[in-house]
């Protein structure tokens, strides 16, 4: 019974997040760029590290993606909200991976009957940054 409740609660949470309007994002030092169905909120370089913050499509459960890149290597990816275990897994798996390889592996992944997913949104953001 507990497993059913947890699965039902997770399904409700993801469905509710899917049906919500996109989260409004605050302006940062760099201009907000709207591309496709996601927004690049900030894109800054400090001490050789490129810091990117993006809000993914309202079609996915996550609400923010934070990316750190040095050269062409992804150093860190952190998702806010969404499926926590999967988001941590994505970040751990692509740490140290080249941007091109991450795009190749994540591009086009869907989530259920949705046309996109959290990994696909990351690949779209990375494509835009190239």
Language model features by range: what are they?
Residues 24-70:
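Structured beta-strand/loop patches that form or line metal/cofactor-binding pockets in enzymes
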Residues 17-20:
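Boundary of Sec targeting at the N-terminus
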Residues 56-130:
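Active-site- and interface-proximal helix/loop "cap" or "latch" segments in soluble metabolic
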Residues 4-13:
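Sec-dependent N-terminal signal peptides
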Residues 12-14, 53, 75:
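A general, composition-driven signal for non-globular sequence regions
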């Amino acid at each position: 019974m507990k497993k059913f409740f947890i699965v039902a609660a997770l399904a409700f949470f993801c469905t509710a997040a899917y049906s919500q309007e996109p989260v409004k994002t605050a302006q940062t030092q760099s201009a907000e760029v709207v591309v496709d169905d996601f927004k690049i909120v900030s894109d800054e370089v400090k001490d050789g590290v490129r810091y990117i913050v993006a809000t993914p499509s309202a079609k996915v459960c996550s609400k923010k993606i934070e990316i750190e890149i040095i050269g062409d290597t992804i150093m860190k990816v952190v998702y806010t909200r969404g499926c926590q275990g999967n988001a941590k897994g994505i970040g751990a798996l692509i740490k140290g991976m080249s941007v091109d390889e991450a795009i190749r592996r994540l591009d086009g992944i869907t989530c259920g009957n949705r046309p996109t997913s959290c990994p696909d949104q990351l690949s779209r953001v990375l494509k835009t940054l190239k």
